[in-house]
């Protein structure tokens, strides 16, 4: 694997394509790209300029505990079975590698780490789901802002949202809560969908998934929550007897639930149905079990999303040459790029 200094990587100030040859790497600038480690704040993204005229933008999110500075170099260096890299396959794409803010992680004794949101152990994804709310709201809002800016620059049909692991989970939440125009595609590696158990149950006509408390112990008696079952069973303001909810179709109810849960308002748009999704997942993933990826795909299917998932035999919690090759083919099709 090549060293970081060999990759086309810069911080906020990028080298323009005219300053180098078509296939020459941008010099790596550690000083320019070093993430600011102020807790709770998003560091400046690392931006990789396109090799040719800027026509597309890829917004890329790393996994929990990583940063853009760590995540970008290996992704830029890996080659597909046909010998392509991300930059040679998409020479017109600006690559924006985002870095999550540093926040306290509950399962790591509240130590500070870069994470898009806090969560409980992956072995029990339906437990302590209230931990995810604040981070998902903040991170999805941050991603929405980047999407808006890049769509304004190159057009919605030329913007891609991409994430690994927790970055994939955040990308999917950002997609489901997006109320702008449909962008080109979302791609995820080794990912999962937060609140998947509750979303699936709502779409299937249930009320609260498998019985686990989505809101946390301190909110079990919250009468203001339309999804809470703790009130009077004859009170039409509780559960799915609420008129505002029962007038909606089930997928819209699920998206409304998601938006309510992370406090993003109740304007439940369904734009995500017009944004194709590709998910790649290794069958031997030791951190995000493939069952969680399958659950995410099932939920997206039930919500009416255009989703495809490819499983990679023997692959652990990472991506492979084959996965990247499949993703490149998918993106070429959605971006209407011929090889």
Predicted regions and their residues:
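The feature captures the conserved acid-bearing segment of alpha/beta-hydrolase catalytic domains
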Residues: 49-52, 180, 185, 191-337
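Residue in the alpha/beta-hydrolase core beta-strand immediately N-terminal to the catalytic nucleophile
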Residues: 158-160, 185-187
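N-terminal cap/lid segment of alpha/beta-hydrolase-fold proteins
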Residues: 2-51, 56, 133-139, 223-253
């Amino acid at each position: 694997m090549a060293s970081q200094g060999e990759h086309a990587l810069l911080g906020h100030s990028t080298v323009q394509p005219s300053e180098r040859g078509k296939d020459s790497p941008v010099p790596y600038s550690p000083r320019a790209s070093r993430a600011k480690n102020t807790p709770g704040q998003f560091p400046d993204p690392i931006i990789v300029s396109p090799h040719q005229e800027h026509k597309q933008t890829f917004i890329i999110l790393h996994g929990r505990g990583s940063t853009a500075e760590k995540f970008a170099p290996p992704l830029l260096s890996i080659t597909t079975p046909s010998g392509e890299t991300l930059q040679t396959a998409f020479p017109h794409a600006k690559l924006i590698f985002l870095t999550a803010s540093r926040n306290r992680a509950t399962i790591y004794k509240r130590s500070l780490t870069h994470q898009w949101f806090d969560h409980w152990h992956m072995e029990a994804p339906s437990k302590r789901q209230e931990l995810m709310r604040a981070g998902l709201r903040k991170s999805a809002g941050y991603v929405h802002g980047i999407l808006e800016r890049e769509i304004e620059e190159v057009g919605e049909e030329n913007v891609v949202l991409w994430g690994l692991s927790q970055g994939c989970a955040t990308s999917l939440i950002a997609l489901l809560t997006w109320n702008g125009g449909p962008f080109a595609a979302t791609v995820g590696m080794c990912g999962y969908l937060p609140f998947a158990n509750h979303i699936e149950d709502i779409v299937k006509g249930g009320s609260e998934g498998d019985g686990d408390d989505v809101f946390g112990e301190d909110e079990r008696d919250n009468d203001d929550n339309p999804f809470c079952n703790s009130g009077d069973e004859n009170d039409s303001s509780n559960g799915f007897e609420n008129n505002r909810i029962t007038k909606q179709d089930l997928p819209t109810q699920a998206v409304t639930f998601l938006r309510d849960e992370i406090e993003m308002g109740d304007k439940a748009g369904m734009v995500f149905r017009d944004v194709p999704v590709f998910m790649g997942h290794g069958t031997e993933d030791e951190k995000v079990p493939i069952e969680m990826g399958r659950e995410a795909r099932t939920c997206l299917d039930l919500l009416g999303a255009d989703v495809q998932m490819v499983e990679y035999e023997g692959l652990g919690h990472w991506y492979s040459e084959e996965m990247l090759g499949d993703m490149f083919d998918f993106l070429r099709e959605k971006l209407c790029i011929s090889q």
